[in-house]
């Protein structure tokens, strides 16, 4: 999914935090219009910094996103919104097109 995004038109102005420390990511996150990623600490940090977050919920319960209106979620295909659990294990069922579509809605 990440490689599809990086190679898309939307991905040309994005980069991954995979080799950065949390502290190194803070100024980048704060200056973003939108955070896109799975339900991890970086998404929650983005929300704490008042940045909209599109969180990919592969196997995270809805309660992890319900605390802020800045969070929009994408669930695996075939899973009803808000019905993911720790046992969903849906990372291979997340639609790139759905993530891209939701991303474009949130930045426009």
Predicted stretch roles:
Residues 44-107:
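Nucleotide-sugar donor-binding patch of glycosyltransferase catalytic domains
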Residues 1-58:
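Donor-binding and catalytic core of enzymes assembling or modifying cell-surface/extracellular glycoconjugates
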């Amino acid at each position: 999914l990440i490689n599809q995004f990086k190679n898309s038109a939307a991905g040309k102005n994005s980069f991954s935090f995979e080799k950065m420390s949390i502290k190194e990511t803070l100024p980048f996150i704060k200056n973003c219009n939108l955070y896109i990623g799975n339900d991890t600490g970086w998404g929650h940090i983005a929300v704490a910094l008042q940045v909209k977050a599109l969180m990919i919920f592969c196997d995270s319960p809805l309660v992890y996103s319900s605390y802020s209106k800045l969070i929009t979620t994408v669930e695996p295909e075939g899973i009803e919104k808000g019905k993911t659990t720790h046992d969903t294990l849906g990372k291979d069922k997340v639609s790139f097109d759905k993530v891209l579509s939701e991303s474009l809605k949130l930045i426009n």
